[in-house]
Amino acid sequence: MLGISEQGFRRLEAYKMAQLTEPAFMIPVESSNVEAFGYVDEDQTLFVDFLAKGNSAGSRYVYYEVEPEVYSQFMASPSKGSFIWTHLRDRYDYEKLR
């Protein structure tokens, strides 16, 4: 894989997916913190668009290796922001994409 680790390659693919697949990929939600989310089963990546706050633009984060069961719990959660804070933020690798 051209000197890149498998994990690095998967992250690059997730990043490209996030850049190329805008509206159809993301599912909008009614939330005070989260605008939309999307999940890719093949590499277990969860994308989350957070709402803009004040003068700050909204941001997109990607969470890596989120198991399908955890994604199902996230979808069923009445508070997406609280779920991210308590179940994802300190347990999964993540990064800000924009």
Each language-model region and where it sits:
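Acidic/histidine-enriched, beta-strand-rich ligand/metal-binding domains
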Residues: 2-98
